[in-house]
Each structure stands twice: as structure tokens, then as C-alpha cells.
Amino acid sequence: MESTDKLTDTNAILAYLYETFPLCFIAEGETKPLKIGLFQDLAERLADDSKVSKTQLRVALRRYTSSWRYLKSVKAGAQRVDLDGQPCGELEQEHIDHAQAMLKESQEKAKAKRAAQTPKAAPAGKAPAKKAPKKVAVPARKTERPAKAAPKVEPVVNLVQAQLTDLAKKQRVNVKLGMTPVAGVITDINKEDIHVQLDSGLTIKVKAEHILL
């Protein structure tokens, strides 16, 4: 029987790692580059911990190492650290270049997405034509509407295919429907059939291979 304390949300798993390995996973401020092969050490250290699975740890680790905060820490002179915060050697230039390229690409994508969602302004030098004011006793005032704020850009989350053993009732998951994953909650697990209630209210039955975490 699965523990009722099992963590299913990636943010909750990251918070657990911040608490369990505070010298390795930094919750706020500048982070430290992680030891190569740290996932294996993490999986072994938490092998008897029923709160997390290897799949969930892999998703959380990928989220942590793809964040801008982490990519900015991969720079010349920085030391990699293990789970206990012990130095494991300096970074190689190849890894620094790769991290900076990933950071630049991610920032450019976010900038392009914001630009696409922001209403286009009138071209410079082409002011809208003004009509001659009408002569009236009391000129009517136009109510100015406040400009709409640009929608908040959500961070890109890398989803991975779930294993049946990683799933539990009331767990938040994403279901592969066409090209775009759809969010929902697991309502029942019957052998290999997973019943998921989508956020739209629709309940569907899928296999574990169609579930993303």
C-alpha cells in the first residue's frame, strides 16, 4: 500500500530536496553547480524514502538544473558540489559554454513569447490622425481604459512519461491528448487503466503510457 505522505507535485519535491540537502540544493539566491552523476547518488540516498520515486526525482532535478538561476551559476571558477555540499572539482569550459547557450536560448524564447502576447503599438512616426474638435458648450470627456498587463509567462516544464508504480489517486498529472498535454487529477486506478478527471470536468480512461509528470 502506498504511503499517504507520497509527494506528487514537482515544487513539493524540490522543497523536500531543499530541506533534506540544504548544502547541495539552494532554495534562494545563487545556486551551486551539481556533481556529474548526482542523480544516481540522490536515488541511492533516498532509496528507502517512500515519499518520492526515481521518476519524480528525475523531473525535479531537470526542473532545478534548467532554471535560469542554476544556469547562471555554471561559470568559470565555480566548483561542483555533491549532496553534502563537498567540492567535486571545477567546471569544464565545455559545460560552461553549454549552460550559457541554454540560458540564452531560454531567455530569448521567453522574450519572444512576451512580445507575441503584448498588444502591438502604432509604428513610430505615424501618429493617429486627429479629428478637429467640435464646438460644444461642455466637451464630453473620454474615459480612458487602463492598459491590460501582459500575461505572466509560465516557466517551461519538461514532462516525462510516467510509470504505473509512480501513480496514485488524487495525484495531479498531465494526459497526452493530441499535441498538447491536458492537466487533470487521477480519480481511480484499476490494474492498468487510469481514470483521470480533466480540469475541464471530463473523465477519461487511459494507460500509464499516456500520463506525463
Swiss-Prot record:
One of its GO terms (molecular function) is RNA strand-exchange activity. This is RNA chaperone ProQ. The keyword Cytoplasm applies. Residues 115-127 have a biased composition (Low complexity). Pfam families: ProQ, ProQ_C. RNA chaperone with significant RNA binding, RNA strand exchange and RNA duplexing activities. GO terms for biological process: post-transcriptional regulation of gene expression. One of its GO terms (cellular component) is cytosol. It comes from the Bacteria. Residues 105-150 are annotated as: Disordered. Gene3D superfamilies: ProQ/FinO domain. The gene is proQ. It comes from Shewanella oneidensis (strain ATCC 700550 / JCM 31522 / CIP 106686 / LMG 19005 / NCIMB 14063 / MR-1). InterPro entries: ProQ, ProQ/FinO, ProQ/FinO_sf, ProQ_C. Keywords: Chaperone, Cytoplasm, RNA-binding. Belongs to the ProQ family.
